[in-house]
Amino acid sequence: MKMIQPIHFPTVSAFMHALGRADVRHPLIEVIHLDDLADCSAFGNTRYTMGFYSVVYKDARCGTVRYGRNEYDYDNGTLLFFAPDHDVELGTLEQSYQGVMLIFSPALMQGIQMSPYTFFGYSVNEALHVSERERQQLHDILGNIETELERGIDRHTRQLMAQNVALILNYCIRFYDRQFITREPVDSQLMQRFTVLLDDYFAQGLAARQGVPTVRYFADALNLSANYFGDLVKAQTGNSPQQLIQQHLIAQARHRLTTTTDTVSQIAYALGFEYPQYFSRLFKKQTGLTPQEFRAQA
């Protein structure tokens, strides 16, 4: 099957022109009401990349969307987040939809740290589902942005726009925290699977063959994006996946140091370290003792 070549929209203005909008209200940000578009179906069955961030809120059921490796058929009250320069593939679309799309350039957010907004790295099957009350909160902030867009550009516009975008994203962090709580039974099962996978990785000798396990390895095994997996684990345990992996690794090391006569180098290689000194450094950082000192005291 021939791969569809993506259509690239480098800027907010380029995207607005493609929608048939000759007048761009601001070159770095725009709010698009999907029901104002003449024919959404024309954008279906196509791959896109964009040089800007986009946040899409859908009021009604939409067609399929592929983002990264996953496909999702999403429903009412759903928010999707797309980072710049990622492939977005749309399936068959209907002619019209109810919803809002917020698009903004990375240049707008200069001076604002984007790293806390990890949901831009989530897969589409990890979308945010919002309540009516949450939807109204976001709608009110979008209203502020629309007011600024209609007002015209002055020396305050950029800062006010960026602050309102950041406010929306901060609310989305809160709403995702709520979603993690309401999904706790499902997420607890994922945590149990993660623990089993972690145990098996060392029990089956994968560490010696493939190296120290990575967060990406377990996220892939659970069919989650690395960002969503990290936030899920943090919400469930208070620790990052990397911290849990290191804790498990040190527990394995303690066991081997006290129950075998293997050298420190042999243990390091068995646990996936290419260089024993890296293992010794991590062990001392975690325990306050070198492996040799720990073995001597055991």
State what each model feature region is:
Residues 1-66, 70-72:
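Generic protein-terminus/edge-of-domain signal
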Residues 77, 229, 278-279, 283:
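Short hydrophobic/aromatic patch on the recognition helix
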Residues 184-222, 243-262:
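A short, Lys/Arg-enriched amphipathic alpha-helix from helix-turn-helix/homeodomain DNA-binding modules
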Residues 280-298:
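…primarily DNA-binding HTH/wHTH and HhH modules…
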Residues 91-153:
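A hydrophobic/aromatic-rich effector-binding and dimerization subdomain
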Residues 69-81:
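Short acidic-glycine-tyrosine-enriched beta hairpin
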